């Protein structure tokens, strides 16, 4: 017996949509949505394909996701070619199966079933889909959100299909995410010969006390919803490669994953104060990729929890852990934002896979959420 969720997932996987190339994935979704009465608006920016689709009017529930995937890696290590979906022992293998073409298929099929049962639903059902979430994410959801906000578009609830689950579908729901702030710091010294240190100024030596103090800082202790802010040095570079040259510059890149206890400005001020304290000559470039956001218990969280409890008979954990997602952009619209998707154990890995039965279950959960919020 065929399953529409699995069939659509397989069709999407067959399209090697490496960021930001969509390779026809959105056309598949648009065709299905148009048939059930959705209005489609293409919102492409640069090399990225996006679309905004809606049906009905009033209080709005949007489903958000991305059609792009990360590279497959060494294809010889896959049990089957990564863009040829295969089911083995109930597991559907293929790049994007879990992140997040399975979720996209579940969303579309859930919408089809919902509209068939509720052709005159009271609220508005919408889709916000992009082909660039895995790479730069500069021309994707963020640009669509900016355009929607500019015309005062309404968005009350948003369910992002990111693979939130850890062991069984629905065991973890993400109702927020930490902020992400990166510092690209260059400490300036004077290059010279290692035998004549008095004629040079070693930026590595200069910066060592600063870095030692930086990594020892307790930024906050988190709160009921977020773990404590984390700072990690990601890259550090200096020198010419020669053992007799004192470097002229030291480059250090570090990233903060911060809670709602801090703002990005508070972090910047403290780092700059520390640099001044150690009397360093420096240039700095900050990159804020997302503010922290939190969706407290309310209509969306309650609907999601209800759907999971109804179909999987478990009580999900509400967590804000992990990396960033496009939910950080959508939250700017004032919407309640929650992430619910399949198990994430194999995402971005060789032999990415998802339990086929989980995708069927996910479609039913999505449909029940629609029924609670916009039926």
Swiss-Prot record:
Cofactor, how bound (note): Binds 2 Zn(2+) or Co(2+) ions per subunit.
The main enzyme category here is hydrolase
Per the record, the GO terms for biological process are: diaminopimelate biosynthetic process; L-arginine biosynthetic process; lysine biosynthetic process via diaminopimelate
Instruction: Give TM segment ranges.
Output: none
Q: What keywords sit in the KW lines?
A: Amino-acid biosynthesis, Cobalt, Diaminopimelate biosynthesis, Hydrolase, Lysine biosynthesis, Metal-binding, Zinc
Task: Kindly tell me the pathway this chain contributes to.
Answer: Amino-acid biosynthesis; L-lysine biosynthesis via DAP pathway; LL-2,6-diaminopimelate from (S)-tetrahydrodipicolinate (succinylase route): step 3/3
Annotated active site: 68, 133
User: Which of this chain's residues are annotated to bind Zn(2+) 2?
Assistant: 99, 134, 348
Q: Where on this chain does Zn(2+) 1 bind?
A: 66, 99, 162
Write down the required cofactor(s).
Zn(2+); Co(2+)
EC number(s): the record gives 3.5.1.18
Q: Where on the tree of life does the source sit, at the highest rank?
A: Bacteria
- Name the reaction it catalyses: N-succinyl-(2S,6S)-2,6-diaminopimelate + H2O = (2S,6S)-2,6-diaminopimelate + succinate
Q: Name one GO molecular function term.
A: cobalt ion binding
Q: Which cysteines are joined by disulfide bonds?
A: none
Q: Name one Pfam family in it.
A: M20_dimer
Amino-acid biosynthesis among the record's keywords?
yes
User: Which InterPro entries does the annotation name?
Assistant: ArgE/DapE_CS (IPR001261), Bact_exopeptidase_dim_dom (IPR036264), DapE_proteobac (IPR005941), Peptidase_M20 (IPR002933), Peptidase_M20_dimer (IPR011650), Peptidase_M20A (IPR050072)
NCBIfam families (UniProt xref): dapE_proteo (TIGR01246), PRK13009.1 (NF009557)
Known partners and oligomeric status: Homodimer.
User: Under which name does UniProt file this protein?
Assistant: Succinyl-diaminopimelate desuccinylase
Organism from which the protein derives: Salmonella typhi
- Provide the taxonomic classification: Bacteria, Pseudomonadati, Pseudomonadota, Gammaproteobacteria, Enterobacterales
């Amino acid at each position: 017996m065929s399953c529409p969720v699995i069939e659509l997932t397989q069709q999407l996987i067959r399209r090697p949509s490496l960021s930001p190339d969509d390779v026809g994935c959105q056309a598949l979704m648009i065709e299905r949505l148009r048939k059930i009465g959705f209005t489609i608006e293409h919102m492409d920016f640069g090399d990225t394909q996006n679309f905004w689709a809606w049906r009905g009017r009033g209080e709005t529930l949007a489903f958000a996701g991305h059609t792009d995937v990360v590279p497959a890696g060494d294809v010889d290590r896959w049990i089957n070619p990564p863009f040829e979906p295969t089911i083995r022992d109930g597991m559907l293998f293929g790049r994007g199966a879990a992140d997040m073409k399975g979720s996209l298929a579940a969303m579309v099929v859930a919408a089809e079933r919902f509209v068939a049962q509720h052709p005159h639903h009271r609220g508005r059902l919408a889709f916000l889909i992009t082909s660039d979430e895995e790479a730069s994410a500069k021309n994707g959801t963020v640009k669509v959100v900016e355009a929607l906000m500019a015309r005062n578009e309404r968005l009350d609830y948003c369910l992002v299909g990111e693979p939130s689950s850890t062991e069984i579908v629905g065991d973890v729901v993400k109702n927020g995410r930490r902020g992400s702030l990166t510092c690209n710091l260059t400490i300036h010294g004077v290059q010279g010969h290692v035998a004549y240190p008095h004629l040079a100024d070693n930026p590595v030596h200069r910066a060592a006390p600063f870095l030692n103090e930086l990594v020892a800082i307790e930024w906050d202790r988190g709160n009921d919803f977020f773990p404590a802010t984390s700072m990690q040095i990601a890259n550090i570079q200096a020198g010419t490669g020669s053992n007799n040259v004192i470097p002229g510059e030291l480059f250090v890149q570090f990233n903060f994953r911060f809670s709602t206890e801090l703002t990005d400005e508070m972090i910047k001020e403290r780092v700059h104060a520390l640099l001044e304290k150690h009397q360093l000559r420096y240039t700095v470039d900050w990159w804020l990729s997302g503010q922290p956001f939190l969706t407290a218990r309310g209509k969306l969280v309650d609907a999601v929890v209800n759907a999971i409890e109804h179909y999987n008979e478990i009580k999900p954990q509400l967590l804000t852990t992990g990396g960033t997602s496009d939910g950080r952009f959508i939250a700017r619209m004032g919407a309640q934002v929650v992430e619910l998707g399949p198990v994430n154990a194999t995402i971005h890995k060789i032999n990415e896979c998802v339990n086929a039965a989980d995708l069927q279950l996910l479609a039913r959960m999505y449909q029940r959420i629609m029924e609670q919020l916009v039926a």
